[in-house]
A protein has these predicted regions:
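Membrane-anchoring hydrophobic helices of lipid-metabolizing enzymes
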Residues: 1-120, 155-157, 162-164
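Catalytic core of membrane glycerolipid acyltransferases/transacylases, capturing the structured
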Residues: 66-67, 80, 112-172, 185, ...
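Conserved beta-strand termini and adjacent loop/short-helix elements that scaffold enzyme active sites
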Residues: 101-103, 143-145, 170-172, 247-249, ...
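Short amphipathic alpha-helical segments and helix-helix/interface helices
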Residues: 106-107, 130, 156-157, 179-180, ...
Length: 316
């Protein structure tokens, strides 16, 4: 897995972002989506690296050479999901039609009354989980790397002051301690398992025709605290429609110590396999706009590098 995502920086300004979000709430979601078209066209034309990454991914997921319209749909899906996040942060759930698949898996995990890891990816919307949370009384603390999305986070936190309490910043000295604490208190923690900080342990797994590297830390955390892992993705289907999918991919309680490494590898491969399945099902929902298969390692802040290494060793 490439570490290039750590070098990606936001474009634009906080003022511009606040202006767009404010206008969206003024005119409503339908009109706001129309406003996204010129913005998407601009970024598609002038963001060369992102466009190249989009084309490479879509060629794998679609099984053919993507057309310009495919690239545009990819950018527009990303912009729509980003816009919808702000409506969800303001509890505007009535704007969306959400279907849930794997309700039995979700309900079984809730009935146990224990903490659980929700392992997602930059595929679709994790925020749409808030809509399901109203029915299931589900609150999830999200583990995020915040340094390359400061403007978005600033605007989001201003809209929903309770949001910072549900975010665990990745790459800090106390990151994993907070994760352990939440899980030990039987809370749910969401982690995106398709990115890793430099220095973190990774293992290869087949993904869309080529091996990619994925982090092992979620599985080590689950083993340490004997908590299950559910794969979760919230796919955007167009219009106001989303689908939430839940699948159990790892049961840490049943793994003997001597079999841990093999169990981690199997679970990681299962994660990569389910991620590939949903990428093919909804290819325009893939929001990693960099070369995912490039194993290059750009420089990473020292605190993130050291912290991730310590976190991995603590879980072995």
């Amino acid at each position: 897995m490439s570490h290039a995502w750590l070098e990606q920086r936001e474009r634009g300004s906080i003022f511009g972002m606040r202006l767009i979000v404010g206008a969206a709430f003024l005119v409503g979601r339908t009109m706001a989506r129309l406003m996204l078209h010129p913005i998407c066209l601009y970024f598609l034309l002038f963001s060369v690296k992102s466009r190249r990454a989009s084309r490479k991914f879509l060629s794998r997921a679609l099984g053919r050479r993507p057309h310009f319209s495919d690239l545009y749909r990819h950018y527009f899906a990303f912009a729509t999901v980003a816009l919808d996040r702000f409506f969800l942060l303001k509890d505007r759930y009535e704007l969306f039609e959400v279907r849930i698949h794997g309700q039995d898996v979700l309900q079984h995990a809730l009935d146990r009354g224990q903490g659980c890891l929700l392992l997602g990816a930059h595929l679709g919307s994790f925020e749409i989980l808030r809509a399901a949370g109203t029915s299931y009384r589900l609150e999830v603390a999200m583990v995020m790397y915040e340094d390359n999305a400061k403007m978005v986070n600033t605007v989001a936190n201003a809209m929903n002051p309770a949001l910072p309490d549900r975010i665990i910043g990745l790459g800090r000295l106390d990151s994993m301690f907070k994760v352990y604490d939440r899980l030990q208190r039987n809370a749910w923690v969401g982690i995106l398992g398709d990115r890793v900080l430099q220095g973190g342990e990774q293992l290869p797994a087949p993904f869309l025709g080529e091996a990619a590297l994925f982090p092992t830390s979620p599985y080590r955390i689950a083993l340490m605290l004997k908590r299950p892992i559910l794969f979760m993705t919230g796919l955007y289907l167009g219009g106001n429609r989303y689908e939430l999918h839940f699948e159990k991919i790892f049961d840490a309680e049943t793994v003997p110590r001597a079999a841990r490494e093999a169990a981690i590898e199997r679970a990681l491969h299962r994660y990569a396999g389910r991620l590939e399945h949903y990428c093919r099902k909804a290819p325009y929902n893939w929001f990693n706009f960099y070369d995912f298969w490039d194993a290059g390692s750009p420089a990473v802040p020292a605190r993130a590098n050291k912290t991730e290494g310590a976190e991995e060793r603590s879980g072995s």
